[in-house]
Amino acid sequence: MSAQPVDIQIFGRALRVNCPPEQLDALNQAAEDLNQRLQDLKVRTRVTNTEQLVFIAALNVCHELAQERLKTRDYAANMEQRIRMLQQTIEQALLEQGRITERPGTSFE
């Protein structure tokens, strides 16, 4: 579906943005999250300039995103290593089983 104009409130300011209907709930949740972040920053930093608060919030979100990307990359590398180890273990077990069943003089029939 195509995006529809939607009105949201961010830190007391009305904004009209385009949003696909199926993403409206996510947009509203993001707006609530941003409002909370801005309010927390205002209290914590005592900065009253809205523009400055928005930039600080944007920097914080970018930093959090970078940290999550690092975590995801580390997790993926860890999983790849575990998969390789599991593959090696399986291959080794299959080789050993092949040696057991292929020994001369040993018949399991």
From Swiss-Prot:
It is found in: Cytoplasm. Activator of cell division through the inhibition of FtsZ GTPase activity, therefore promoting FtsZ assembly into bundles of protofilaments necessary for the formation of the division Z ring. It is recruited early at mid-cell but it is not essential for cell division. Belongs to the ZapA family. Type 1 subfamily. InterPro entries: Cell_div_ZapA-like, Cell_div_ZapA-like_sf, Cell_div_ZapA_eubact, Cell_div_ZapA_N. Homodimer. Interacts with FtsZ. NCBIfam families: PRK10972.1. This is Cell division protein ZapA. GO terms for biological process: division septum assembly; FtsZ-dependent cytokinesis; septin ring assembly. Residues 21-99 form a coiled coil. It comes from the Bacteria. Keywords: Cell cycle, Cell division, Coiled coil, Cytoplasm, Septation. Transmembrane segments: none annotated. PANTHER family: CELL DIVISION PROTEIN ZAPA. The gene is zapA. One of its GO terms (cellular component) is cytosol. Its main location: cytoplasm. It comes from Edwardsiella ictaluri (strain 93-146).
